[in-house]
UniProtKB/Swiss-Prot annotation:
Site description Cleavage, residues in chain: 92-93
Protein name per the record: LexA repressor
Family per similarity comment: Belongs to the peptidase S24 family.
Reactions this protein catalyses: Hydrolysis of Ala-|-Gly bond in repressor LexA
GO molecular function ontology, one term from the record: DNA binding
Active-site residues per Swiss-Prot or TrEMBL entry: 133 (for autocatalytic cleavage activity), 172 (for autocatalytic cleavage activity)
EC number: 3.4.21.88
Function: Represses a number of genes involved in the response to DNA damage (SOS response), including recA and lexA. In the presence of single-stranded DNA, RecA interacts with LexA causing an autocatalytic cleavage which disrupts the DNA-binding part of LexA, leading to derepression of the SOS regulon and eventually DNA repair.
Assembly description: Homodimer.
Keyword Repressor set for record: yes
DNA-binding region: 28-48
InterPro entries the record matches: LexA (IPR006200), LexA-like (IPR039418), LexA/Signal_pep-like_sf (IPR036286), LexA_DNA-bd_dom (IPR006199), LexA_repressor (IPR050077), Peptidase_S24_LexA (IPR006197), Peptidase_S24_S26A/B/C (IPR015927), WH-like_DNA-bd_sf (IPR036388)
Length: 214
């Protein structure tokens, strides 16, 4: 691949092969260990170079969110781990009705422990994404997001937010702005949504994503 250093080419090739094998992107430490690179900061530097040269896209606040650009997305051949319940669909767009609870879920997804980092799989659930409001965060229609059960979130974190008076839920970045909440899409064509802070309930924070490669 022209314009890349030898190290950048090796990192790119490793990412592609890792996605083919596992169905999700490697963490920085995976790359460092496998390619015997001196430090994670060196890996991060080369990932920034790959991104600036237009070969990958990254979403910094989500574990393992690396996407190959202008390349055939490799299909996973192996995906091991434990099952996490898929509780329903979440809107990446306008809010939709709250998904069913886990007691009524007959759907699940096989998730490697590594994909959620330090989060225990028992504290994690999954939702299928409907819509395109988070495409600039590398989350597209048909992807599955993994969320950690929690009722609080910091500014800028991606969450499942329930609009209480409408009993609907949406996937957005959350920002607390005094007595109101801004739910911000990651799509330049869409506008933020604003609600009174008392009308918004955090139902989970996004900790990973499984891409729909079909």
């Amino acid at each position: 691949m022209s314009g890349l250093s030898q190290r950048q080419q090796r990192i790119y090739d490793y990412i592609k092969q890792f996605i083919r094998t596992n169905g999700y992107a490697p963490a920085i430490r995976d790359i460092q260990r496998e390619l015997s690179i001196s430090s994670t900061s060196v890996v991060a530097y080369n990932l920034r170079a790959l991104e600036s040269k237009g070969h990958i896209r990254r979403e910094g606040n989500i574990s393992r969110a690396i996407e190959l650009i202008n390349a055939e997305q490799p299909l996973p051949t192996v995906l091991g781990g434990q099952r996490v319940p898929v509780l329903g669909v979440i809107a990446a767009g306008q809010p939709i009705p709250v998904p069913n609870d886990s007691a009524n879920s007959d759907d699940s997804v096989l998730v490697p422990e590594e994909i959620v980092g330090n989060d225990k799989l028992g504290d994690v659930y999954a939702l299928r994404v409907k819509g395109y409001s988070m495409v600039d965060a590398l989350i597209a229609d048909g992807d599955i997001v993994l969320l950690r059960y929690q009722a609080t979130a910091e500014n800028g974190e991606m969450v499942a937010a329930r609009i209480r008076d409408e009993n609907e839920v949406t996937l957005k970045r959350i920002y607390w702005e005094g007595d109101r909440v801004r739910l911000q899409p990651a799509n330049v064509t869409m506008e933020a949504m604003y609600y009174p802070s008392t009308n918004v309930e955090v139902q989970g924070r996004v900790v990973g994503v499984i891409r729909n490669l079909g």
